[in-house]
């Protein structure tokens, strides 16, 4: 075993064959990485391993040679393939003991839900001798904080994200703050951009991307680009000043391309602007099939702004519900600027909303023609000052779902820009 002076940093180990095979997205590792950065903790490596006892043991022993702290998620349940606690104990040849307090907690939680704990559940009360319990406030699987050898500690959490996050905030954060591992206070802010590609944005801010403190890192999403600003200082107030300075510079260079920060989405930003002025919104959708309405209504408080929507997939619904003239459909086709305009005006009139959005297009993979290929989309924005339409050529290569998502984002962004002009 390595000397404690040779170890450094924090590692994350995520356990589960479903993660290894890609059946489940590994959101825990991403969330934990951000938490570690916020705490100013050096984080050097992430690993995913399946539900295999021997591989788990070997990995834990390997990590103990090089790192100060190992964070493990997953494998704490009651079934035979939940091997995390057993494997970690075996890695250091330490026996497991049943913790009476843990078993009592498991039984009490089962009774409060009108259940009787199964015999298998008792396995969750087994912890290595000397380990400290990490109590699970919402589930039955406890975690642990354990220092099996000097200079190396293990923290285990359930794989269920909500349980893991609650336990992390309640117990792990205080432990890390008192551990002496922090290299300062790290803070970060995420800026969201629409209407510019990742490479183009990177060129505009190339000098800022080379900075050391703060750092600026780009991330590409589906239609949007994100820049994360991260700064470190001895106290958070100083770190935030550094972040604010870089954010101001980024906004000056990019203008209205930046639409939000942190948890903002185009939908939430648009709804907030409309709500502040007491205005309402409705939508008419064809190729997005309700995706635009779903994005809007996913935002808490959307009901104060969002009046309703129409999924007008067929020409008959466009004509009968939205009053799209038959001659427009015949002359220009359902996928056209003229029909997008009529859809937006129609749903605005139907619902009595202040603003209305429309989308009509060809999401593919079939249905395209040389004149109107897959990825051709028209969007409309109707408001008190009239209706505008835009043609989008999104192309077929990225697939149907990408076309649908980007179409919804494009029309929301156009409404955002219209609202900025009207402010």
Swiss-Prot record:
It holds the Pfam family CinA. Disulfide bonds: none annotated. InterPro entries: CinA, CinA-like_C, CinA_C, CinA_KH, Competence-induced_CinA, MoaB/Mog-like_dom_sf, MoaB/Mog_dom. SMART domains: MoCF_biosynth. Belongs to the CinA family. HAMAP family: CinA_B. This is CinA-like protein. It comes from Synechococcus sp. (strain CC9311).
């Amino acid at each position: 075993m390595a000397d404690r002076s040779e170890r450094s940093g924090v590692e994350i180990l995520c356990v589960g064959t479903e993660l290894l095979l890609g059946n489940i997205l590994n959101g825990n590792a991403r969330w934990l990485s951000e938490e570690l950065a916020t705490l100013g903790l050096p984080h050097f490596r992430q690993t995913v391993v399946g539900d295999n006892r021997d591989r788990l043991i070997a990995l834990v022993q390997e990590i103990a040679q090089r790192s100060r702290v190992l964070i493990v998620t997953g494998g704490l349940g009651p079934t035979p393939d939940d091997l995390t606690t057993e494997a970690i104990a075996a890695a250091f040849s330490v026996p497991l003991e049943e913790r009476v307090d843990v078993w009592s907690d498991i039984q009490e939680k089962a009774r409060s839900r009108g259940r009787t704990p199964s015999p298998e559940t008792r396995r969750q009360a087994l912890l290595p001798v000397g380990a400290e319990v990490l109590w699970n406030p919402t589930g039955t699987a406890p975690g642990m904080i354990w220092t099996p050898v000097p200079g190396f500690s293990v923290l285990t959490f359930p794989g269920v994200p909500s349980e893991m996050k609650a336990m992390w905030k309640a117990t792990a954060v205080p432990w890390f703050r008192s551990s002496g591992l922090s290299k300062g206070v790290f803070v970060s802010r995420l800026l969201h951009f629409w209407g510019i590609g990742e490479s183009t944005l990177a060129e505009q801010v190339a000098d800022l991307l080379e900075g050391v403190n703060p750092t600026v890192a780009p991330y590409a999403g589906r239609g949007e680009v994100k820049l994360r600003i991260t700064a470190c200082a001895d106290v958070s107030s100083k770190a935030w000043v550094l972040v604010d300075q870089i954010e101001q510079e980024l906004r000056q260079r990019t203008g209205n391309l930046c639409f939000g920060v942190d948890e903002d989405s185009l939908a939430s930003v648009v709804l907030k602007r409309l709500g502040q002025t007491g205005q309402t919104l409705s939508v008419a959708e064809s190729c997005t099939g309700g995706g635009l309405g779903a994005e809007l209504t996913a935002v808490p408080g959307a009901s104060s702004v969002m009046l309703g929507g129409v999924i007008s997939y067929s020409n008959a619904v466009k004509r009968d519900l939205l009053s799209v003239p038959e001659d427009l459909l015949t002359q220009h086709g359902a996928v056209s600027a003229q029909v997008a305009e009529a859809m937006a005006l129609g749903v605005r009139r139907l619902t009595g909303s202040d603003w209305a959005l429309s989308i009509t297009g060809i999401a593919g993979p079939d249905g395209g023609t040389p004149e109107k290929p897959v990825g051709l989309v028209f969007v409309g924005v109707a408001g008190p000052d009239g209706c505008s339409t835009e043609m989008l050529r999104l192309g077929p290569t990225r697939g149907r779902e990408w076309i649908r998502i980007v179409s919804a984002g494009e029309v929301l962004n156009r409404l955002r820009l219209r609202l900025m002009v009207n402010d």
